[in-house]
């Protein structure tokens, strides 16, 4: 009975966490460059994997199947294994604002170890040192003329320098070249991650590497193609309809576990009362 309580509890916790992830995605459906989080729920994996290849588990000798093998004891319950960002391209939104710039995904190599496709990001100077990365191209000019993001982080060029322009009358070409009065002043910095699942997602649509090292420039990567579009923003890649469906599914699963928990509670109450009468 207590094992059943544990199973129900883990189910409720996992579904509650999944609900929180989905609602956060929906809340950021209109946030430029936002990458939706995806959760993975696993059940009894540890004991199952440990049993693979274990020849010491007894098998019913009456079964005429020489290659059959039992998996042994199975751990009950589920848990939310991991939460990963979906780095698929969001739709483009025209803003007619010079400082709004969208990154356009092209072709990226596949990481052989993880099977994930690579991803590109704008380079930002983090105030605590190192770099931060974002897909939100909703930039502005600070009082000194530097191109910054909504948090005031400096947008970096491909050479790692801050980008300064005299006013918002500048042009960004399809290859990222920033020009003022037909004079090239910089090239927008873009970094590439072969396995973006290893990046740490921060607040405000920012990403950083786990160890604080800087990602390599996307311009120097073989097989990486991309472009830029000024006066546009990349919208979030949240699928609102799917998110609503997933939210209802998670809620129903939580509700089902809750009813099972109530049934266990009544059974235990009955057992205690009957034992008390003995």
Where do the PLM segments sit?
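Amphipathic alpha-helical polymerization modules
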Residues: 1-278
């Amino acid at each position: 009975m207590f094992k059943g309580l544990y199973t129900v509890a883990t189910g409720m916790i996992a579904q509650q966490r999944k609900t929180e992830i989905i609602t956060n995605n929906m809340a950021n459906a209109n946030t430029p460059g936002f990458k939706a989080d995806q959760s993975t729920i696993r059940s009894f994996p540890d004991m199952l994997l440990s049993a693979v290849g274990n020849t010491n588990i007894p098998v019913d000798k009456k079964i005429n199947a020489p290659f059959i093998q039992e998996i042994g004891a199975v751990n009950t319950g589920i848990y939310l294994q991991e939460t990963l960002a979906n780095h698929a391209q969001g739709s483009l939104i025209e803003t007619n604002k010079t400082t709004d710039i969208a990154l356009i995904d092209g072709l990226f190599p596949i990481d052989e170890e993880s099977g994930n496709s690579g991803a590109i990001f704008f380079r930002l100077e983090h105030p605590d040192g190192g770099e931060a990365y974002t897909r939100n191209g909703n930039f502005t000019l600070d009082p000194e003329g530097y191109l910054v993001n909504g948090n005031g982080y400096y947008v970096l060029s491909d050479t790692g320098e801050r980008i300064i322009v005299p006013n918002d009358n500048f042009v960004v070409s399809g290859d990222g070249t920033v020009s003022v009065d037909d004079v090239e002043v910089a090239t927008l910095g873009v970094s590439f991650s072969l396995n973006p699942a290893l990046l740490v997602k921060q607040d405000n649509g920012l990403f950083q590497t786990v160890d604080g090292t800087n990602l390599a420039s996307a311009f120097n990567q073989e097989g990486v193609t991309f472009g830029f579009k000024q006066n546009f923003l990349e919208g979030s890649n949240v699928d609102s309809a799917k998110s609503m469906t997933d939210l209802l599914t998670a809620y129903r699963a939580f509700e089902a576990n809750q009813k099972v928990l109530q049934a266990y509670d009544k059974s235990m109450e009955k057992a205690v009362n009957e034992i008390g009468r003995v």
